[in-house]
């Protein structure tokens, strides 16, 4: 993609758990990204992207900053965003379902909640 379109590539890593194997997998993938000059960043997400599930952010706590961007996703909400940013110190946060309106029996009322978005932004800026 990078060679043809000349756009930055962001690699995604799905974090499944907190075992030694998970930590080793994260370390190996991070090393691969750091060695790849075409990769602009790495996105850490939960084991099932889009499911709104968090993972143990402490697994990323000691990642050293480099010129690669660190993206954090997976179950972020206004309530946990400040702790996530404090623990991981990402360059970018990714939120979707965490700022949606509460479940409504009518699909016509689904969508993003402006108050939740405002609170989320306030909390990640702390």
What name fits each language-model region?
Residues 1-73, 77-80:
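Conserved anion-binding
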Residues 4-7, 91, 120:
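Compositionally biased, intrinsically disordered low-complexity segments
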Residues 21, 25, 55, 59, ...:
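Alpha-helix N-cap and loop-to-helix initiation/capping positions
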Residues 42, 56, 60, 84, ...:
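Conserved, mostly hydrophobic/aromatic
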Residues 47-49, 87-117:
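Glycine-rich phosphate-binding active-site loops on the catalytic face of alpha/beta enzymes
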Residues 65, 86, 122:
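Short, well-ordered alpha-helices that flank and scaffold nucleotide-derived cofactor binding pockets
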Residues 126:
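Catalytic phosphate/metal-binding cores of nucleic-acid and nucleotide-processing enzymes, i.e., regions
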